[in-house]
Amino acid sequence: TLPYLFIPLCVLMEKIGLIEDARAEISEAINILKRVSDSNSPNTPSNDNFSKKLALNICGTVPVVYGFGIYRAVAQRLKQQFNENSKVPAKWEFFPELNHNEIVGWERAGELARCFSVLFIRDDDEPEVIRQRIETTKELISKESMEIFEICGQGRRRLAKMLSTVVI
């Protein structure tokens, strides 16, 4: 249902001048969502299915979702999907804020860190400063033996990128 909520919002934002071409945003998002849905469908074998592989790898852990910029809301939504659909506790944080306090918690987590899996929402066009923060954060927390995964936004436009990460 989430994509359907965005379409009227895109049209409205175009009418008030916040975006230039709502049709292009929506069209690309639909195409990307079809591709992502097909490649992650229940009929797609696990070795070719990102969603299934991710689910198998994070099973039995508490998912921690990290986002930035446009993916801040996506991180929160994924956390809510874990809670609602998978019936597991989860948490989310966002860059750059998470680098202030979150890292200290991981440095002191010890064996408890093994109970968590960290999902970084990434983007090929992410700002260099964010890329550096993500890579540094991955280095710091990988010392704690946690499972680390990346979910990369697909497409060129913001709507497609955001929705492609939500539907995994």
Task: State each model region's role.
Residues 1-168:
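A SIS-like phosphosugar-recognition module
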